[in-house]
């Protein structure tokens, strides 16, 4: 799935939206997404708390494998 950041308009590929991250000693629902690092331009994976991700990104394209 391709998502767009609400403020920057940058596009990212959603890798996994059903994972966990330990933040401040507490396990929270999280997502992993991939995009270009704004400093280096290299592709990086990012992790964000799911609720924060849902507030800052919108789906722009749902890419299905082998379609």
In which residue ranges do the predicted regions lie?
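Intrinsically disordered, low-complexity, charged/polar segments
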Residues: 42-67
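Short beta-strand-centered aromatic/proline hotspots
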Residues: 10-19
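Glycine-centered tight beta-turn/hairpin loop motif at sheet-sheet or coil-to-beta transitions
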Residues: 7-9, 41
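Short coil-to-beta transition motif at edge beta-strands of beta-rich domains
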Residues: 1-6
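Residues that flank catalytic or metal-binding motifs in active/ligand-binding sites
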Residues: 10, 29, 53
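Basic/aromatic-rich interaction segments and small domains that mediate binding to polyanionic partners
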Residues: 18-50
């Amino acid at each position: 799935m391709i998502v767009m950041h609400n403020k920057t308009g940058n596009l990212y590929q959603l890798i996994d939206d059903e994972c966990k991250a330990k933040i401040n000693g507490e396990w929270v629902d999280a997502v992993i997404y991939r995009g270009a690092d704004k400093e280096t331009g290299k592709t990086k994976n990012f992790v964000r708390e799911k609720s924060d991700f849902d507030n800052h990104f919108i789906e722009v394209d749902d890419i299905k494998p082998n379609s």
